[in-house]
Amino acid sequence: MNITILSKETIKPLAPTPHHHKYYKVSLLDQFAPSSYMPFIFFYPNKFADRDAAGILTQLKESLSQILTIYYPLAGRVKDTVYVECNDEGVEFIEAQANGSLSDFLKQPDIAALNNFLPRNGNGLEKGCSISPVAIKATVFECSGIVLGVCIFHKVVDAAAAGEFLQSWAKIGRGSKETVELPNFTSASSLFPPRESLSSKFVRDFDNFFFQGSKSFMRRFVFDATAITTLRTKATSEKVPNPSRVEALMEFVVQHLSTAFKTAKSETPETLMITHPVNLRKRIEPPLPDSTFGNVIWLAFAFYDCDPSETKIKPGDVVERVREAFAALDKESISELETDDAFTSLSELLESVYTNEKIKIYRFTSTCNMGFYDVDFGWGKPVWVAHMGNMVDYRCKQQIVFMETGHMSKDIELWLAAEEDELSVLEKNAEFLAYATPNPTIWLDSDGTN
């Protein structure tokens, strides 16, 4: 597959941002977010014999200009750790052409090629004094199938807010009569005021926690609904009789990844550290609306002390620790996040973890139930929403992402970034493969014509 860039242009808001909105104040939680782009890749087959690809690209750009008037911080530039300058500099929009058929690509998805659909490096450490919060790349196949690659800067929004933005853009794009809900730009920074300055040591420790210099390779696996039900049953315990889908999958993945690590490296870590971001919008009192802009998340930290004599983590052990970590983020602990004590504790934790080679970190996240399969611009919902390909320079190591597989589907995709020797062991593990299908075909709807 060859992709040729045809044009690059900057899409600016349809109307100028008012002067009193020139600076968007970030929150403390934004400051704690990774300095990287979140990648999302949407695949839209051609369902119409007379599809006008050029007209669709124009529609995308015009609707983007309209939504940027509402989501004006995304058309600005991240200038420092406290503010986004809402200067209407705009969003880069790249048009590209791919040879071949989209359906052929989806029959056997080339994970390593996915980065070609993105306008930026996904999940890489970004440094600079003027970072664009959003970048778009639209790639049209010869069959008029379209792939939309979106990169959104994590220090401005979390995945839930990104989903709200993309669904709102799609509503305008398809001419929906539904009202686009106005984003709430003030609640997050009011509840969690930013620190006017962050020490260089904290920034360094934070970057070292999330980003490491080794190359990570991406793999995609799919757990069908039957497999997930079985794994939930296996993960039950007296303390957690009803593990969620994500909790059960987290335990299963940690069980087999830790085994793969021990086999590949011939060593056993002393402790496993398992993290997962938690959406705080509904945990805050009173709850915040889904339209709350920014990062309104906090990491849940779970720890598992390894026993060298154990060949495998016992069923239910990881789920219990993860459930306790989630439960610890209650109203009281959330209210204390902006205190000096909490800041000091986080700083000490980050430093102790990244400097201790005996701690193995598994960083989980999930985009399930965030509406990414509802991003319909008028030519149907995407048949696939993908993550990204391999991570080359300063990428998040041991990144584990759960994603939905389609609209109304009960299956879950696992996107796993790890070192090649660990992945090689995992891909030969019959017990793991009994539940996880490696990179299956993406099936088009029955009326897909490409």
From Swiss-Prot:
The keyword Phosphoprotein does not apply. One of its GO terms (biological process) is indole alkaloid biosynthetic process. The active site is at residues 154, 376. It is an enzyme of class 2 (transferase). It comes from the Eukaryota. Optimum temperature is 22-47 degrees Celsius. A motif (Nuclear localization signal) lies at residues 218-225. Gene3D superfamilies: Chloramphenicol acetyltransferase-like domain. Keywords: Acyltransferase, Alkaloid metabolism, Cytoplasm, Nucleus, Transferase. Its EC number is 2.3.1.322. Pathway: Alkaloid biosynthesis. One of its GO terms (molecular function) is acyltransferase activity, transferring groups other than amino-acyl groups. Its main location: cytoplasm. It is found in: Cytoplasm; Nucleus. Optimum pH is 6-8. It catalyses: rhazimol + acetyl-CoA = akuammiline + CoA + H(+). Acyltransferase involved in the biosynthesis of akuammilan monoterpene indole alkaloids (MIAs) natural products, components with various biological properties such as antidiabetic, antibacterial, anti-inflammatory, anticancer, and antimalarial activities. Catalyzes the conversion of rhazimol to akuammiline. PANTHER family: F21J9.9, VINORINE SYNTHASE-LIKE. Monomer. Belongs to the plant acyltransferase family. This is Akuammiline synthase 2. It comes from Alstonia scholaris (Dogbane).
